Amino acid sequence: MQTPKPRPGSLEVPQKKSPASTPKTARKLKTSESDPVSSPNTKIRTPKTQSPKVVADRRSPRTPVNEIQKKRTGKTPELASQISQLQEELKKAKEQLSASEALKKEAQDQAEETKQQLMEINASEDSRIDELRKLSQERDKAWQSELEAMQRQHAMDSAALSSTMNEVQKLKAQLSESENVENLRMELNETLSLVEKLRGELFDAKEGEAQAHEIVSGTEKQLEIANLTLEMLRSDGMKMSEACNSLTTELEQSKSEVRSLEQLVRQLEEEDEARGNANGDSSSVEELKEEINVARQEISQLKSAVEVTERRYHEEYIQSTLQIRTAYEQVDEVKSGYAQREAELGEELKKTKAERDSLHERLMDKEAKLRILVDENEILNSKIKEKEEVYLNLENSLNQNEPEDTGELKKLESDVMELRANLMDKEMELQSVMSQYESLRSEMETMQSEKNKAIDEALAKLGSLTEEADKSGKRAENATEQLGAAQVTNTELEAELRRLKVQCDQWRKAAEAAATMLSGGNNNNNSNGKYVERTGSLESPLRRRNVNMSPYMGETDDELSSPKKKNGSMLKKIGVLLKKSQK
């Protein structure tokens, strides 16, 4: 009988590149190899539906051992290709790990940079707060010195007024002539106009004090607003911390779910190993399919949960950044408002200083006028004394020469009566002027007391404002620290979310690969089950002898006899790869 040549397809199958076709070709080779080893009694037991190629293979005589070894060694490239594929996957996983480490390093560098920036910002804010404190202290000292100077000037003015009052009282006794009455009336009118001007200036000072009170109340309101904003920032920081805690809990839940998936995979591997001796249990395959579907559903749920957490995190991060920007803008606005108010207060102080200088000049003018009046009074007194001497001399002469000088005496008496009447009028005018001076003095004293009270209140308010500014600065520092901690936790959560996403993708790919392997094993089992059942009992003793000759015989026989073992080995490899990626 002629020995038929082996089919070229059995040797060309391992050279194909697609990994999905390897199990089918391996099974075909096994079936073709098992035919020549089988006994010649196969002619009786073979059915009529068998292909002519299989019959021709069975009729062929026994092939030598060297040819069988060559055929067996042809399967080594398949295993080498699978090993190379696994090595490539390992390389890809290592590259992904290196990329994730680089991303972690970049995130750490960015976190350090942000920390340095926050420290610089805190230092600049502390320096600004110290400068503001120094400026406020210097201004308080300047205001106190100005107040003391004003009080001294008021004391000098009161002393000058008292001296002028004494001089006016002296003038009551000294004024005796009618020529200076008109001049005194003019001077009184001028003094009245000056008094009216002083009253207007006092009203202006009152209005300035009211404006200062309004400014202080406005600053207090703005400080309250700033405190409210700081409280809002604190509440936002607490919310951010709560959100971070919720995210951490969600991450822990996802980790527990991943662990449960790992346990499921391990259970599947154990079940595959336990069911390695069974051949073609359809119920176990269906259970495996159901478990794989459940794993897919869990992976999809995990993926959706990770996406939801990422969206929440991005939304919270955007909200926190917006709140931080608004807080910084509010702080800048408050600082600009303080600067504007300081400028306004400086302008008001300059105006008050100018008004004080003008009042001082007017008082000096009044003192000069009073000195002039004193000199004129002295001159008038000297004239009165001279006239009295003349009057005495005339009386003496009248006593000596009464009949001659009666006309002159009458004239002198009439002149004296006129002078007395003029003196009475001047005394009345002086009394009215004195009453006006006393009323003005009382008004000045009341205004001074009100000014002192307003100054004390302003100083107390300034002290409270400085304390509130210190407290607000401390609160701002605490808020910035909380925001920095929240940003650090956010970066850590981002890294964990990315790692979980990578793990979920790896789980999904592993589940898809396992599903494809199981589906391929099922199809091959269903198609070749009958043939294996029919030809499984026709093994020759030659095959049993050659089982231990090659190291790959055990693996190929196991693959042909139980495809579940092959799937279990693939699942084990996938589990090892996932563990390496997690490390």
UniProtKB/Swiss-Prot annotation:
Transit peptide: 1-55
InterPro entries: ICR
Protein name as it appears in the record: Interactor of constitutive active ROPs 2, chloroplastic
Function in brief: Acts as a scaffold, mediating interaction of ROPs with different proteins.
Main localisation: plastid
Family statement drawn from the similarity comment of this UniProt entry: Belongs to the ICR family.
Quaternary state and interactors: Interacts with ARAC8, ARAC11 and KIN13A in vitro, but not with ICR1 or SEC3A.
Organism, as annotated: Arabidopsis thaliana
Annotated region (Disordered), positions in chain: 1-80, 101-125, 518-583
